């Protein structure tokens, strides 16, 4: 049906036949193609409220770095981010204690981290160093970690420097000395690798050193004024924390598991995590490679299990709207099932703004990924707490976007609960401020009209019913809820519940507009309709021919326009279709006569006659300036030609004077069935919604579907 905000115009496109009696479930769904408010656009702005996610095959951005060995995996990861680094850092493949503090320094030096065997320079690593051709090679750890023989071999590829220490704690302090000045430091246990590498990307991003400590004894460090302790008191004891507090302010980030720890770091430090590196939290080499990659890409690291994503990590990917994943290691580290589960959906940021556009014939979620011809975005669960805004208009439930006519994005609001669909329709078909009984009558008419379309997709336009998504109003919600399931039937079958804005004081019979005569859609006087009046003027002379050089029409054809050009485009289209089928274009020079004849059962003008003089430009570029025709059509057809928003009904008369025609009319719309303004007046007079429906649809029964 049709809605024009203050004044409502309704039309019916369906064939008026009795609808067979069918049983409809109260929880039936309906889908809506969004055209009315969205229009035809090549880009749409999306903004979710609550939890919405993109779903489908491989919708997230994913990459996996998996070699046959840790050396190859490190090589693959380094190749993805570095081309010709000035420095390469080398660590022992197994002795994790050397590598724990190195990531912040690697970030400072913009250096990849590679593995080697202790006594032999691993061939894969050697080839990678040769490829990078660095000026400097930095060895981490003493000769027991990486031998002098390896060091000597490395000298053929660049200047070699070694950072070592008599123990892991001194080594971390010596690495910290290479960081320059800093106002904050990270203190972690030196007994396990997960705590230090979990915080490493954050520390690297801010230039904070990572200092190792024993659980119950803090080495003699010169600490800055701010310290972050990573891990619970089982990793770094309360006594160590209290010792640090004597000189520094302390923030502790605990975690009951390694998986929870990486999540807590992101949450407590309020880090952006739309892109993350995922590693198996039990595998040192994968975690070190992941920490190096994350620090280079300014992303975060999350630990997962081989066959599952722990709840803490899932919570981060949801709350932080993670859409890009780098997986470290083969499927023996992180299974294909885990990768696929993350690849096949990702959450959008609550309150975030995204731009969906067409790029080279495909849908592109800007700054995220390019897809195919469709993309589905759905809420975590259907709820008014989860909403999605499309170009500023909110909708509930799932929206599927597809490319239409190769150039437009067409959203479909999928599987809306039918009664919620009505809540989005009623305030767009009748002002929500009107009397509740009028709104209830409107609701029953709208429900009856659309209930047979459950399980299908309908438009949100006046071609069916205007659906405004989550444009709910408490008053219209009440009307829907208080009439839940109520419909109109005639002899046991659903009726075609036509309605219009105003009938002008007389309802129209269905057979006067459509081919079918329906016993409950009859012509009769309506004393409650306010008989809304309107006028429309059309000038007799449409082109100022005195100012035109009629001998040279090509000089003015493209610039000359009719006085009422906006209202005559349909008339010109009729001429091109019915009279001048091979012409390029026509112009209306004058309207020489306009009249209406015949009267319908509903007191409306049956036939319209318009005599026009027009000019023709042929497809070959020749002109004819002496054409005349009389257009004789049903008045409803002329109304469509001129425009139903200005030629508001066929309940009309015409007055002629020397310069113009004045069409005077009553009502707005076809006049069949219920008058919305009439329903308003009847409700204000005290009529119940059932009485209103009984008047406009005589012989019908108000019942449940």
From Swiss-Prot:
Induction: In stationary phase; under control of SigD. Repressed by LytR.
Transmembrane portions of the chain: none
One GO CC term on file: plasma membrane
Region of interest: 3 X tandem repeats: 64-349
Keyword Signal part of the UniProt annotation: yes
Annotated compartments: Cell membrane; Secreted, Cell wall
Keywords: Cell membrane, Cell wall, Cell wall biogenesis/degradation, Membrane, Repeat, Secreted, Signal
Source organism, top-level taxon: Bacteria
Function per UniProt: Possibly involved in cell wall metabolism during spore formation. Enhances the amidase activity approximately threefold.
Stored PANTHER family: AMIDASE ENHANCER, N-ACETYLMURAMOYL-L-ALANINE AMIDASE-RELATED
Protein name: Amidase enhancer
Gene that encodes the chain: lytB
């Amino acid at each position: 049906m049709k809605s024009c905000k203050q004044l409502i115009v309704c039309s019916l496109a369906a064939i008026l036949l009795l609808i067979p009696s069918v049983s409809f479930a109260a929880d039936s769904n309906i889908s809506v193609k969004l055209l009315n408010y969205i229009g035809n656009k090549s880009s749409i702005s999306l903004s979710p409220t609550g939890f919405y996610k993109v779903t489908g095959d491989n919708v997230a951005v994913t990459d996996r770095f998996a070699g046959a060995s840790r050396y190859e995996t490190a090589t693959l990861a380094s190749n993805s981010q570095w081309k010709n680094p000035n420095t390469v850092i080398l660590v022992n493949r197994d002795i994790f204690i050397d590598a724990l503090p190195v990531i912040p320094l690697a970030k400072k030096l913009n250096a990849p981290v590679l593995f080697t065997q202790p006594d032999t320079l691993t061939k894969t690593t050697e080839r990678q160093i040769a490829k990078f051709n660095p000026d400097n090679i930095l060895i981490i750890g003493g000769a027991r970690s990486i031998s002098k023989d390896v060091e000597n071999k490395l000298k053929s590829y660049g200047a070699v420097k070694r950072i070592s220490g008599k123990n892991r704690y001194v080594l971390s302090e010596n690495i910290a000395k290479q960081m320059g000045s800093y106002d904050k430091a990270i203190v972690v246990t030196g007994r396990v690798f997960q705590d230090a590498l979990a915080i490493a990307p954050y520390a690297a991003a801010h230039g904070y050193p990572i200092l190792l400590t024993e659980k119950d004894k803090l080495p003699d460090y010169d600490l800055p004024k701010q310290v972050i302790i990573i891990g619970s008191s089982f990793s770094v004891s309360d006594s160590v924390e209290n010792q640090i507090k004597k000189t520094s302010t302390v923030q502790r980030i605990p975690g009951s598991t390694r998986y929870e720890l990486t999540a807590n770091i992101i949450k407590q430090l309020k880090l952006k995590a739309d892109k993350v590196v995922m590693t198996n939290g039990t595998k040192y080499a994968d975690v070190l490679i992941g920490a190096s990659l994350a620090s280079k890409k300014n992303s975060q690291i999350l630990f997962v299990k081989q066959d599952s994503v722990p709840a803490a990590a899932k919570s981060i990917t949801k709350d932080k709207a993670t859409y890009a994943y780098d997986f470290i290691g083969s499927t023996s580290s992180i299974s294909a099932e885990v990768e696929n589960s993350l690849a096949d959906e990702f959450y959008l940021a609550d309150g975030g703004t995204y731009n969906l556009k067409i790029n080279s014939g495909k849908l592109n979620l800007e700054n995220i990924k390019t897809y195919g011809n469709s993309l589905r975005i759905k809420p975590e669960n259907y709820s008014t707490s989860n909403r999605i805004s499309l170009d500023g208009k909110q909708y509930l439930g799932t929206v599927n976007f597809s490319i239409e006519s190769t150039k437009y994005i067409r959203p479909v609001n999928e599987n809306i609960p039918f009664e919620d669909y009505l809540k989005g329709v009623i305030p767009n078909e009748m002002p929500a401020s009107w009397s509740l009984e009028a709104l209830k009558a409107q609701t029953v008419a709208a429900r009856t009209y659309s209930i047979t379309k459950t399980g299908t997709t309908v438009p949100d336009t006046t071609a069916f019913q205007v659906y405004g998504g989550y444009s709910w109003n408490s008053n219209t919600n009440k009307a829907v809820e208080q009439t839940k399931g109520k419909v109109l039937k005639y002899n046991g079958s659903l009726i075609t519940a036509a309605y219009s804005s105003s009938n002008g004081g007389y309802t129209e019979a269905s057979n006067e507009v459509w081919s079918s005569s329906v016993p409950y859609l009859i012509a009769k006087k309506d004393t409650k309709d306010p008989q809304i009046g309107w006028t429309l003027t059309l000038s007799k002379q449409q082109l100022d021919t005195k100012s035109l050089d009629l001998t040279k029409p090509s000089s003015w054809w493209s610039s000359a326009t009719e006085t009422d050009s906006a209202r005559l485009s349909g008339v010109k289209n009729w001429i091109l279709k019915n009279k001048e089928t091979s012409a390029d274009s026509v112009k209306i020079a004058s309207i020489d006569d306009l009249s209406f004849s015949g009267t319908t059962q509903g007191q409306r003008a049956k036939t319209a006659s318009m005599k026009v003089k027009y000019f023709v430009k042929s497809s070959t570029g020749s002109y004819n300036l002496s054409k005349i025709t009389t257009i004789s059509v049903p008045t409803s057809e002329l109304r469509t030609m001129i425009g139903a928003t200005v030629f508001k009904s066929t309940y009309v008369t015409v007055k002629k004077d020397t310069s113009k025609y004045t069409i005077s009319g009553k009502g707005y719309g076809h006049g069949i069935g219920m008058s919305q303004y009439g329903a308003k007046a009847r409700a204000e007079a005290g009529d119940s919604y059932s009485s209103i429906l009984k008047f406009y649809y005589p012989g019908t029964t108000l019942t449940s579907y």
